[in-house]
């Protein structure tokens, strides 16, 4: 069985073209009962994604396609602690967009699964992430033989993904136009790393098998990994930090003091 573990929505600004209702319709049309939302560098659409999944009886998986100026990995949430760490990972990346992904994940890799296709970063990550939580990603545009070689060298399992950005090939030109606008470039001057090819559309299981005919184990691994991911989510109760200050005036003074300390720490001056 195949599960889409790398899908981008309109909440990947200037990249993704799929609305959340469209994602639900595509998953149901392919008889898929589990789906991951892995927008670029953010969880902006995740709560709405969970709501749509509940209405469509689809199991929602939280994730992020973490992209810096130098590196890229796919991160999926295993448990609640992993979700908290994913939030920390995203915040760290936005604090330093040129930072090293390995340095970030070294602090916050507990409770998440990491998939990558670049052998150099996978080697770094394998020094502190166990092979039970680190995988080689086979996505459109990569040769099966190349990914297999990386897998054998690092002794890591392969997981196939669709790296989805749009519904079908006819939407590729729109994706290209958005990327050109985002990069302040013409279509002809776009760098090949700035956009996706027309292969990054939402495929059915049969179409994924056709794409990767020699990697059935990697396709099945997507189901295996999805079963290990957190899919039960509750956003009903608002979570506030515990603060035992009965007097409202004292609470306001404490809040003002903490904000001032934090602002000075972050900005150096007020």
Stretches found by the model and what they are:
Residues 1-270:
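Phosphodiester-processing cores and adjacent nucleic acid-binding clamps
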């Amino acid at each position: 069985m195949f599960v889409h573990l790398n899908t981008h929505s309109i909440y990947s600004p200037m990249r993704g073209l799929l609305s959340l209702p469209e994602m639900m319709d595509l998953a149901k049309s392919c008889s898929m009962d589990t789906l991951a939302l892995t927008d670029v560098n953010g969880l902006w659409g995740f709560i709405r994604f969970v709501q749509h999944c509940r209405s469509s009886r689809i199991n929602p998986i939280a994730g992020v396609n973490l992209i810096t100026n130098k590196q890229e990995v796919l991160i999926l949430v295993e448990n609640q602690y992993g979700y908290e760490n994913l939030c920390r990972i995203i915040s760290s990346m936005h604090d330093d967009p040129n930072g090293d992904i390995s340095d970030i994940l070294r602090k916050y890799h507990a409770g998440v699964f990491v998939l990558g296709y670049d052998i150099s970063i996978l080697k770094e990550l394998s020094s502190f992430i166990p092979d039970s939580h680190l995988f080689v990603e086979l996505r459109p545009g990569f040769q099966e033989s190349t990914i297999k070689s990386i897998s054998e060298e690092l002794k890591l399992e392969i997981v196939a993904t669709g790296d989805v950005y749009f519904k079908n090939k006819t939407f590729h030109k729109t994706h290209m136009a958005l990327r050109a606008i985002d990069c302040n470039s013409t279509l002809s001057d776009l760098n090949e790393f700035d956009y996706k090819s027309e292969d990054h559309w939402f495929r059915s299981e049969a179409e994924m098998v056709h794409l990767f005919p020699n990697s059935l184990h990697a396709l099945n691994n997507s189901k295996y990994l999805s079963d290990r991911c957190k899919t039960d989510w509750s956003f009903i109760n608002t979570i506030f930090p515990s603060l035992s200050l009965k007097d409202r005036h004292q609470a306001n003074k404490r809040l003002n003091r903490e904000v001032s300390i934090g602002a000075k720490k972050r900005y150096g001056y007020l």
